[in-house]
Amino acid sequence: MSSPVNNALTVDVEDWYHVCGIGGQTVPPRHSWRVEANVGKILALLERCRCRATFFMLGSVAESNPELAPMISAKGHEIASHGYSHTLLSRMDPQQFRDELLRTERILIEQTGQRPVGYRAPQWSVSPLTPWVDEVLAEHGYLYDSSRSPLPFVGDASGPRHPFRIATAHGVLWEIPPMVTPTRLVNLPSAGGWGFRLFPLAMVRATIERYQREESPAVLYLHPREVDPDGPRLRLSPLKRFAAYGTRADAAPRISALLERFRFTPLREMVAAWPSVS
């Protein structure tokens, strides 16, 4: 990898009501949807900072908002796949996963003219319970996955912090984990979500600088609802409410400060500069 190392800002394009692991939820009426306006805020922030990002599009959101993916792509950002229904992969079988992957792919190709080469599972839900994911992704020409988080509870706390290659019957796939802050006891979720909003910005900066010294990209992630502090909320258990909405400050100023300090590039371009996955 070159020095200074490029980092990546990734956006999981879903709406305020897309929360994993809750049943019986219906899609709210269209007038309450916020994703288009919030993505617009993120695009404006990126334009001000002259930065390009990777947007993991939820297929159902792209289908219901057909102007969204073309608008993002027209700004020079990468369009990748976040699946279709925002269902944990542990609740799918291989065929259901394949069907969702291809359904989202067809939608994004029709809307943007480009086939996605990257994938991220809802809530980092690639795990030993889903050993078939890598094979399906590689079979359908995906170059990278960003679904394994080196964290407890939502990933594998002992998993690698840096990108690594996975051999499959259909070729090699890059796995690109999100940034975490290592401590003596546990890795901390400093790259996005509640951790990014809660921990001191100085700690996040120091972690990015550590990744730079290790010659590895720091991968940050953002949800559109995180630039909408006054947006609607679901009624959730205390733990899920904290994870989804806790410390509900506007993440945009923090993201802006990091974009102005460090180099960022879309994951697709980052992977293209690495050793061949063929």
Regions found by a protein language model. Give the residues of each.
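Active-site beta->alpha N-cap acidic-glycine motif
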Residues: 2-78
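Generic enzyme active-site microenvironment
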Residues: 10-13, 80, 120, 221
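Short acidic/His/Gly/Ser-rich catalytic and metal-binding motifs that mark active-site loops
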Residues: 16-21, 184-186, 229-234
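Non-membrane alpha-helical structural segments and their capping/turn regions in soluble enzymes
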Residues: 32, 36, 94-102, 201, ...
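Generic structural signal for well-ordered alpha-helices
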Residues: 39-43, 66-70, 98-105, 134, ...
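C-terminal domain-boundary segment and adjacent tail
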Residues: 48-49, 199-278
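Metal-dependent polysaccharide deacetylase catalytic core of the NodB/CE4 family, i.e.
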Residues: 49-130, 142, 147-154, 171, ...
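Active-site-adjacent pocket scaffolds in enzyme catalytic domains
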Residues: 114-115, 121-221
